[in-house]
C-alpha cells in the first residue's frame, strides 16, 4: 500500500503580521497533485493540524478544502490525529460523520485502530494522538512519570498481527542522543517540567511509525520510525532546509521510502548589511529578515523596506546588543580588571574596535559619579 505521511501542517500559522494561509494553500495544492500522480492509497496526518487550539474560520476552511478534495474527489482514506497544538475535543466534532466518509480522525485517545486492505492483506493503523502526562495518568495510572512510561502503557496490550502502522505525535529519540537539539521554530514543549522524550525503541514492532511533532524530516533509531517534518519552513532558522513530503510504500515484507520535494510560494531570506546597500537590492516578495550593520537607528526603516520588499518581516541591528548575536557566548576574562577595562574588552569583543577617547571620557565621568554615590 502506498501511503503519504504528513504532519505538523500548522494551518493558520502566521509570522509577525503575515498569515501563511496563501503559502499553505499553494503547498496543499501541490500535495493533492502528488497524491494523484503517485497513486497514493491513503494519507496519514500525524498531528498539529492547526497552529492553535482555536483555529480561525479561514484556517478551518483551508483544511476542509484539503480533506474534501482527498475523500470526495480523489476518494482515498485519510487517517489523522491531534497534536499538542490542536484541540482534541474540537477535532472530534462530527467524528462519526467523518468516519462514514473514510476520514478517520482521533482527537481524544480511544485506542482507535483502523484496518485497510490491499493485495497483500490487512494493514492495521493505530491512531495514538498526543496526550499530556496528566491525561496519561488518568488513563493508565499514577505511575506514569514520563512519556516513555505513557507509551509503554498505551502499547502493552497491542496485538501486532499482520502489518501494523502507528500514527502518533511525540518527541521520540534514542536515549543516547543529545535530547535538546531538535527544538526550534517555536515548537511548544510537551510538558512543563518532567521529560518530553519518548524512547523510540518502543516502536520497533511496528512495520512503519508515522511521527509528528519535530519539524525536520528524519528517522529515529530505525528508518521505519520517521518524522515527515513540516511541508514549509515556519521560521528563518529553517530557511535553507529543503522541504518535502514522505511517501511510504508498505509491501508484504518490504518498506520503501521516497521524499518528494515541495516548491514554496515565497522564499525565506536573511539579509545582512548596511541599510543603504540593502535598500538598493532588487525588489523581492520573499519573507525577509534584515540584520542591519548600521550603528545608528534608521528612521522608519521598515516602512522604507516595505515599499520595495512587501513581505519584510523583521529588522534586527547586528551591534545593538550582545543578545542579538545568536548562538554565541561572551568570552571575556574579568579577573583583576577595572570597570573601564571591562568596558574596553566588551566593546572590542562586540564591535571589534577600541573605545574612542571621547567614549572613555564619558565612561570615566559616569563611573566616577556612580562611585560618589
What residues fall within each predicted segment?
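N-terminal active-site segment of His-dependent metallophosphoesterases
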Residues: 1-68, 75, 360, 364-365, ...
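Divalent metal-coordination and catalytic microenvironments
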Residues: 8, 28, 43, 48, ...
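Accessory, non-catalytic peripheral segments of nucleic-acid enzymes
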Residues: 37, 42, 249-373
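Catalytic-core regions built around general acid/base machinery
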Residues: 62-74, 195-205
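Short, surface-exposed connector motifs at secondary-structure boundaries
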Residues: 71-80, 283-287
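His/Asp/Glu-rich metal-coordinating catalytic cores
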Residues: 55, 79-221
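Glycine-rich phosphate-binding loop signature in dinucleotide/nucleotide-binding domains
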Residues: 35-39, 74, 118-120, 158-162, ...
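A conserved active-site cap/scaffold subdomain adjacent to cofactor or substrate pockets
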Residues: 200, 207-264
Amino acid at each position: 500500500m502506498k501511503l503519504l505521511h504528513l504532519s505538523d501542517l500548522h494551518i493558520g500559522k502566521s509570522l509577525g503580521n503575515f498569515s501563511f494561509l496563501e503559502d499553505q494553500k499553494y503547498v496543499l495544492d501541490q500535495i493533492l497533485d502528488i497524491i494523484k500522480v503517485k497513486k497514493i492509497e491513503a494519507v496519514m496526518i500525524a498531528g498539529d493540524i492547526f497552529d492553535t487550539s482555536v483555529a480561525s474560520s479561514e484556517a478551518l476552511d483551508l483544511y476542509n478544502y484539503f480533506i474534501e478534495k482527498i475523500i470526495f474527489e480523489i476518494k482515498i482514506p485519510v487517517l489523522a490525529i491531534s497534536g499538542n497544538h490542536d484541540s482534541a475535543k474540537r477535532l472530534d466534532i462530527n467524528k462519526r460523520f467523518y468516519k462514514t466518509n473514510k476520514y478517520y480522525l482521533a482527537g481524544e485517545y480511544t485506542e482507535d485502530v483502523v484496518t485497510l486492505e490491499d493485495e497483500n492483506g490487512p494493514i492495521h493503523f493505530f491512531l495514538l494522538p498526543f496526550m499530556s502526562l496528566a491525561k496519561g495518568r488518568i488513563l493508565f495510572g499514577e505511575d506514569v512519570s514520563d512519556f516513555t512510561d505513557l507509551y509503554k502503557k498505551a502499547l502493552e496490550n497491542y496485538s501486532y498481527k499482520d502489518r501494523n502502522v502507528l500514527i502518533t505525535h511525540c518527541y521520540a529519540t534514542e536515549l543516547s542522543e543529545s535530547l535538546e537539539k531538535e527544538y526550534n521554530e517555536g515548537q511548544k514543549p510537551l510538558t512543563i517540567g518532567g521529560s518530553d522524550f519518548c524512547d523510540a525503541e518502543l516502536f520497533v514492532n511496528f512495520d512503519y511509525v508515522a511521527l509528528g511533532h519535530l519539524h525536520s524530516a528524519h528517522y529515529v533509531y530505525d528508518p521505519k520510525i520517521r518524522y515527515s517534518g513540516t511541508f514549509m519552513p515556519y521560521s528563518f532558522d529553517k530557511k535553507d532546509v529543503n522541504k518535502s513530503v514522505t511517501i511510504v510504500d508498505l509491501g508484504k515484507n518490504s518498506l520503501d521510502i521516497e521524499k518528494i520535494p515541495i516548491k514554496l510560494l515565497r522564499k525565506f531570506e536573511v539579509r545582512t548589511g548596511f541599510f543603504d546597500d540593502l535598500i538598493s537590492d532588487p525588489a523581492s516578495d520573499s519573507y525577509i529578515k534584515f540584520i542591519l550593520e548600521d550603528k545608528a537607528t534608521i528612521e522608519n526603516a521598515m516602512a522604507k523596506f516595505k515599499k520595495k520588499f512587501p513581505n519584510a518581516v523583521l529588522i534586527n541591528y547586528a551591534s545593538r546588543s550582545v543578545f542579538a548575536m545568536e548562538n554565541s557566548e561572551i568570552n571575556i576574562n574579568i579577573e583583576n580588571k577595572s570597570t573601564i577595562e571591562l568596558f574596553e574588552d566588551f566593546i572590542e569583543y562586540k564591535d571589534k574596535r577600541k573605545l574612542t577617547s571621547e567614549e572613555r571620557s564619558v565612561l570615566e565621568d559616569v563611573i566616577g559619579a556612580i562611585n560618589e554615590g
